[in-house]
């Protein structure tokens, strides 16, 4: 017999403890539909801490008390009743294969959930299973694209009036930055500068480096449920639309 492979976690318990407390503090004071915190080692991608809203006990994954962070007790009771009803219908349908019985199983509406649907929602790791626009965190990639491709020298200056007319759309910035250097455009998160940089790079280069940086590709994290993002990344023809290129340059669409 051979020993199995060693399993070593990269989680830093001190970091994990801190982010779980910070997440709880935020949800208690402000709250959101879902709150996520992820801490990575930027040198090698190791996960040092990962926490999401709606914790549950892995030793008791189907403890109904955990669902109270998502639903009221009355909602849970309704789902349990609906689950029993659905199970009874399915048991009947397994004995009766007529067309009428098949149609009876199609009456589930979007707002009806079984208790198992609720648990699946609770167990879902939204950090790896959900997608979000990167927003301003994409701006360094826009600048890096320009520097790597030679579209930028690093000595550029821009003028931000608080918005930029692109086609028939006036696309805004959070502030009127006035004259701004490339370095400050990143530091102050200037949308106007990023749009101008995107235009300077052009659709083909912008798309090329989006792929080089790994957007739309699987991370290969050793956790189940990572979402497929290939269809969320535009191709060069999409970026031929000036508004699309402009907004994607600062991480939105």
Place the predicted regions along the sequence by residue.
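Beta-lactam-recognizing serine transpeptidase/beta-lactamase-like catalytic domain environment
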Residues: 11, 43-136, 141-253
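Conserved, well-ordered alpha-helix/loop/beta-strand core segments that scaffold catalytic motifs
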Residues: 1-35, 43
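Mobile, glycine-rich extracellular loop/lid and propeptide segments
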Residues: 19, 38, 48-50
């Amino acid at each position: 017999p051979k020993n199995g492979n060693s399993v070593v976690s990269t989680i830093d318990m001190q970091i994990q403890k801190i982010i779980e407390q910070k997440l709880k503090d935020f949800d208690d004071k402000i709250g959101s539909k879902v709150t996520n915190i992820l801490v990575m080692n930027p040198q090698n991608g190791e996960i040092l801490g990962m926490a999401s809203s709606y914790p549950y006990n892995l030793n008791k994954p189907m403890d109904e008390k955990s669902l109270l962070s998502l639903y009221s007790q009355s909602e849970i009771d309704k789902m349990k009743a609906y689950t029993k009803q659905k199970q009874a219908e399915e048991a009947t349908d397994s004995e009766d294969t007529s067309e009428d019985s098949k149609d009876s199983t199609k009456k589930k509406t979007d707002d009806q959930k079984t208790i198992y649907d609720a648990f699946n929602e609770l167990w879902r790791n939204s950090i790896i299973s959900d997608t979000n626009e990167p927003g301003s965190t994409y701006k360094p990639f826009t600048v890096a694209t320009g520097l790597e491709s030679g579209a930028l020298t690093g000595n550029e200056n821009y003028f931000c009036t608080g918005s930029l007319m692109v086609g028939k759309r006036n696309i805004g910035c959070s502030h009127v930055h006035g004259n701004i250097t490339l370095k400050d455009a990143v530091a102050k998160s200037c949308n106007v500068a990023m749009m101008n940089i995107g235009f300077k790079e052009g659709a083909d280069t912008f798309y090329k480096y989006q792929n080089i940086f790994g957007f739309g590709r699987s991370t290969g994290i050793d956790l189940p449920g990572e979402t497929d993002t290939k269809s969320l990344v535009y191709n060069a023809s999409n970026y031929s639309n000036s508004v699309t290129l402009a907004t994607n340059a600062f991480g939105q669409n």
